[in-house]
Amino acid sequence: MKLSRRSFMKANAVAAAAAAAGLSVPGVARAVVGQQEAIKWDKAPCRFCGTGCGVLVGTQQGRVVACQGDPDAPVNRGLNCIKGYFLPKIMYGKDRLTQPMLRMKDGSYHKDGEFTPVSWEQAFDVMEEKFKTSLKEKGPEAIGMFGSGQWTIWEGYAAAKLFKAGFRSNNIDPNARHCMASAVVGFMRTFGMDEPMGCYDDIEQADAFVLWGSNMAEMHPILWSRITNRRLSDPNVKVAVLSTFQHRSFELADNGIVFTPQSDLVILNYIANYIIQNNAVNQDFFTKHVNLRKGATDIGYGLRPTHPLEKAAKNPGSDASEPMSFDEYKAFVAEYTLDKTAEMTGVPKDQLEQLAQLYADPNKRVISYWTMGFNQHTRGVWANNLVYNLHLLTGKISQPGCGPFSLTGQPSACGTAREVGTFSHRLPADMVVTNEKHRDICEKHWQIPAGTIPAKVGLHAVAQDRALKDGKLNVYWVMCNNNMQAGPNINEDRMPGWRDPRNFIIVSDPYPTVSALSADLILPTAMWVEKEGAYGNAERRTQFWRQQIKAPGEAKSDLWQLVQFSRRFKTEEVWPEALLAQKPELRGKTLYDVLFATPAVSKFPLSELKEDQLNDESRELGFYLQKGLFEEYAWFGRGHGHDLAPFDDYHNARGLRWPVVEGKETQWRYSEGNDPYVKAGEGYKFYGKPDGKAVIFALPFEPAAESPDNEYDLWLSTGRVLEHWHTGSMTRRVLELHRAFPEAVVFIHPLDAKARDLRRGDKVKVSSRRGEVISIVETRGRNRPPQGLVYMPFFDAAQLVNNLTLDATDPLSKETDFKKCAVKLAKV
């Protein structure tokens, strides 16, 4: 086969990415231009992380047979990470589910029965009976849903609409609660609006990069390649990496900092103190655009109210704050001296000063990146607020190459979980259920009776587990996630709750995951390009793709499942008489009629599409469902700083970053000349706040919920590895990725291993106060913990690491701290 220069470069990019992971390259990736005449190519965003890389998908005879980086995609510019190159294989695991499976005994449903194939009609019959019984006997608070940052935009929107407007239950929450909730609350507290103000274009213009609890080399490798290129192209560019253990991102670091768990709060306040003491505050920016507030402290750990830590907290769950002066703030951070910070964090003084100087230097453009190290933290919201403080003190924000940037881990944690409003407290476009005006806006736009949407915040992820255990939540639908493996403290609440005979659990999934096998009913689900979809990535880029192949067997998209199930309920069965009296014309109609077949949603005909562009749902319903849902949803944000472009624009583009006003996307929000919502002469305007000013919060160090002691003498931190994504339900079914990292290990310092008579490769029992797992000792390799800490990835279903973790959460965001609990090791 003769290759062009461009194809040759592409093939070598694939080989380089594979070599970095120690893998062989699949033939479909290696043969970049082979048999192009027989393969149909179309664009799609990658199925994995929140970077939002663009890929070209090659289909042939109804299957995905090839994949390559999209050279026209601005995010990745033709390059994929190793997971991206193996995308063609994620849908073809030998155990792919192709028909509904119900636990049955003697021909009918039984909690302890064996999984038995049933039709969709039978599956929905059982679901309908369980939903209607719970709604009739206990009301909307007895049903719930756990969704996903992997839902497409219209799937998340349909789910939120069905539960909040249809079933009148706010007990819907996404798995983004476990990864991005602290970022959401941090953004809302400081700026009054969610999501980053900058974009990936900052990378090529920055002078310094600071990673806070983020191993971008493995978790966001395409962005890391751009940072690496920037660092190696200019000797004046600096990289600082902060973590509780060394990892691959340290290889590029000019200043690699390992700190004691939880003490990142101390470092952040020290830097603020350094900026003030060295007269590095941007006084003009600060005076015009910033307010100061002192936050409530001693706020607890999001545990059950009966837990001793919650009983001891003075202000459990409080997000209160009060105004303070600059002198008061200066005095507050003055306590975080260099000596005190070095002592509390274990970080050498020269490294701390070097880090602080990056932020304080007025001539250095600095980007702060963070992911789970900040967010999965019992003070994760505070950590987010404190890093914003540094950028607001110095004015290094909302300009090219400058700004704080929260990275996401799922492909649409931003576009779906956050923007659509699938959290238990949120509605579309940053609106919330507790705000009467916001509820009224939604009810009028959806043309449903006033008062339909409950004002009470629903159950968040961990609260759902507890309610299942307590028998208060009785019907639970889990979609597009594997929470039985991914969620914290499996044995305490979740597993007992799922297997409680009072409860009925539905899991929609393509594979028999730990969650699916723990359920009562499994619904087979279409994946990725087996459906038409849309994701929103970490830089506010909304990206669309067409359905390119059909799902196997009877597998159906999450959207199909939600919409078709809504047909089973008439308004009289879910709404009280007082609501129906407001709109008697809705009597006798199904939730499908009221929510999904409305004139607003169903007005786009199939004639807008070519035959080969039709998707299964629209073909079945007779109208362009996805376009109708998107346009209805997009209305909420237009004119309010969340503007999305018209639907058709996205199919013709490689994504657009909102707000999109008059056809132009926005790279940098809140700054004049970049953001259409900032008028000439305003300079900066943080328009999420009534006065247009961002907030600096004074927040102290507070200890972790659980720390090592004489018995459980090691910190445990959990996370991911390059080759696998989350629980491995897709990547472990790709033979090459599985071979590259076949089982989880315990990364441990050699001296800690020696003290316990452990050697590399030994089997070891890892125990916490909540459970235990058997794993393998690893004293070398990519992750190098300090003494006193071990690190374990959670992708391995044979090693349920979350048997060990504590379900302590940030009291403000309700996000779990997966990075800090106490364990002990014993040789097996």
From Swiss-Prot:
Binds 1 [4Fe-4S] cluster. [4Fe-4S] cluster binds at C46, C49, C53, C81. Residues 1-31 form the signal peptide. InterPro entries: Asp_de-COase-like_dom_sf (IPR009010), CT_Nitrate-R-NapA-like (IPR041957), MoPterin_dinucl-bd_dom (IPR006657), Mopterin_OxRdtase (IPR006656), Mopterin_OxRdtase_4Fe-4S_dom (IPR006963), MopterinOxRdtase_cofactor_BS (IPR027467), Periplasm_NO3_reductase_lsu (IPR010051), Prok_molybdopt-oxidoreductase (IPR050123). Mo-bis(molybdopterin guanine dinucleotide) binds at residues 83, 150, 175, 179, 212-219, 243-247, 262-264, 372, 376, 482, 508-509, 531, 558, 718-727, 802, 819. Its cofactor is [4Fe-4S] cluster; Mo-bis(molybdopterin guanine dinucleotide). It is an enzyme of class 1 (oxidoreductase). Residues 39-95 form the 4Fe-4S Mo/W bis-MGD-type domain. Keywords: 4Fe-4S, Electron transport, Iron, Iron-sulfur, Metal-binding, Molybdenum, Nitrate assimilation, Oxidoreductase, Periplasm, Signal, Transport. GO terms for cellular component: membrane; nitrate reductase complex; periplasmic space. It catalyses: 2 Fe(II)-[cytochrome] + nitrate + 2 H(+) = 2 Fe(III)-[cytochrome] + nitrite + H2O. The keyword Iron applies. Its main location: periplasm. Substrate binds at F794. GO terms for biological process: cellular respiration; Mo-molybdopterin cofactor biosynthetic process; nitrate assimilation. One of its GO terms (molecular function) is iron ion binding. PANTHER family: PERIPLASMIC NITRATE REDUCTASE (PTHR43105:SF11), RESPIRATORY NITRATE REDUCTASE (PTHR43105). Component of the periplasmic nitrate reductase NapAB complex composed of NapA and NapB. Belongs to the prokaryotic molybdopterin-containing oxidoreductase family. NasA/NapA/NarB subfamily. Catalytic subunit of the periplasmic nitrate reductase complex NapAB. Receives electrons from NapB and catalyzes the reduction of nitrate to nitrite. HAMAP family: Nitrate_reduct_NapA. This is Periplasmic nitrate reductase. It comes from Salmonella paratyphi C (strain RKS4594).
